[in-house]
Amino acid sequence: MNRPPLPLAAHDRLIFALDVPGHDEAIAWVDRLGESVAFYKIGMELLASGEYFHVLDALAKRNKRVFVDLKFFDIPATVAGTIRRLSQWPVSYCTVHGWHAGMLEAAAAANQGDMRLLAVTVLTSMGRPDLAAMGIDREPVDVVVERALAAQAAGIDGVIASGQEAGMIRRATGPAFSIVCPGIRPGGPVGDDQQRTVGVAQAFADGADAIVVGRPIRLANDPAAAAAAIQAEIRAAVVQHRD
């Protein structure tokens, strides 16, 4: 059964990608950003430190929302067992790969908490040549929408997908499906390894529930001020979208 999108305040719609190697660096970033960020994504680099769940617990104790981005992909029983245990933690979002219907169904059935499962469709760093190298001679957007519909049918709560595809996903899946967009670039796309990017306002206009931002905050001279500026963009976009 699909869970509806999280009831997020505007301030909770900015997710900072906490791409750091360990606990101390993670907490230093949380302290540095203070009240400007209320939602954090923790991924594979932190997992390799052995301190992943210490960070998750520390974030929860600071009343921060947590997005576990580990892109689970295995046989259905293994993924189901992982989701069953992870759903007992204070986690808002969790990613699973969106390429195996049986695995998606098992993950959805195993989710026993309020956590929303997001299917990974096509990574934002990938373009058509990358898909062609995998034997898929199609445009990324076509694959993304197809995978989003398959995930929805399997009981998954939403997708993590490029803002370029958010509008098409929203039209295909309807309002009761979560869309989280990574690779967001304030002011519009720039040249880096995220190929399919959009700006903040465009992502929300096209139906995103939340956005993930990493480098534009992390590399800023004043990260907290950069996050606050993005929060202002989000508030304006959310108000405009509601109107």
UniProtKB/Swiss-Prot annotation:
Question: What keywords are assigned to this protein?
Answer: Decarboxylase, Lyase, Pyrimidine biosynthesis
Catalytic positions are: 71
According to its UniProt record, in which pathway does this protein act? Pyrimidine metabolism; UMP biosynthesis via de novo pathway; UMP from orotate: step 2/2
Q: Which PROSITE patterns match?
A: OMPDECASE
Q: Which residues bind substrate?
A: 19, 41, 69-78, 124, 185, 194, 214-215
UniProt-recorded Gene Ontology molecular function terms: orotidine-5'-phosphate decarboxylase activity
The catalysed reaction is: orotidine 5'-phosphate + H(+) = UMP + CO2
Name any Gene Ontology BP term: 'de novo' pyrimidine nucleobase biosynthetic process
| Family statement drawn from the similarity comment of this UniProt entry | Belongs to the OMP decarboxylase family. Type 1 subfamily.
Stated name of the protein: Orotidine 5'-phosphate decarboxylase
Q: Which organism is it from?
A: Xanthomonas campestris pv. campestris (strain ATCC 33913 / DSM 3586 / NCPPB 528 / LMG 568 / P 25)
